[in-house]
Regions:
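Electrostatic, structured charged patches in enzyme active sites and in nucleic-acid/phosphate-binding
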Residues: 1-118
Length: 118
């Protein structure tokens, strides 16, 4: 796969079991988690769970702002503890919007997003 105009190698979206994954790495992690769920190691695997991290804002005399959300790659429970994961490359884990949203997840919901770097 060649580079695009920005010099980055584009990721390849994959659809499996009716679920769209942003990359092969995310799909591969899903397959790993499915095996773990079937083996009883984890429970309640969920793809692309979403949380509101900033509520919509109404500003008198203006349009206001829509709510901001964080969508993780996976959520599951292991030994009764909730785990939220995001699959990232070493490049995408540095994106400013991702870093901010990840921090807001912890601030607003008390949820630490675990990074799976591939």
């Amino acid at each position: 796969m060649g580079e695009n105009k920005s010099g980055k190698v584009p990721h390849q979206r994959i659809v499996a079991n009716g679920i769209e994954f942003d990359s092969k790495a995310e799909h591969d992690r899903y397959l790993e988690l499915l095996v773990m769920e079937r083996a009883g190691v984890i429970k309640n695997l969920e793809c692309h769970p979403r949380w509101e991290i900033i509520p919509a804002q109404k500003i008198p005399g203006h349009r206001g702002f829509q709510a901001a959300h964080y969508t993780a790659d996976f959520r599951y429970f292991r030994d009764g503890v909730e785990h939220v994961e995001d699959v990232k490359s070493s490049y995408t884990r540095e994106a400013q919007d991702y870093v901010l949203r990840r921090k807001l997840m912890y601030l607003v919901h008390g949820i630490y997003v675990e990074e799976v770097v591939r």
